Amino acid sequence: WRRDCAFHHSISHTGPITVGVLSEGAIGIDVEFENRRIGVSPSLLLRRMFSTEQDAAACLERWSLLQLWTIKEAVLKASGYGLAGGLTNVALNRQRGSAECFGQVYGLTLLRWHQYLITIAAKQNV
């Protein structure tokens, strides 16, 4: 153990699984069961996740609602704000597979393990 070692970490869990990631730079991870029941209407959740209906519709062409949730939560964790940073503050670049939050760009890695959706967001040095 070294106090001058600047590692960043993030963990997430759902049901029986826990995932974690360690990096030398800012990083976030989120996991969700792909068939998870959502306790609110999808339209309400989309309004809380996106500034405009057009942004929501464009992102739903590429990703499922739960994938979008894992992306936004992983980015907010990597930013250091967590969900308090606000889901609408995460802008997705569908062509590049990246996201922007509070002026920082985050690379995205989307994984599927069994029936779980996992997203890792890593801050990019631009």
Q: Where do the language-model regions lie?
A:
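Core catalytic alpha/beta fold that binds nucleotide/phospho-ligands
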Residues: 1-126
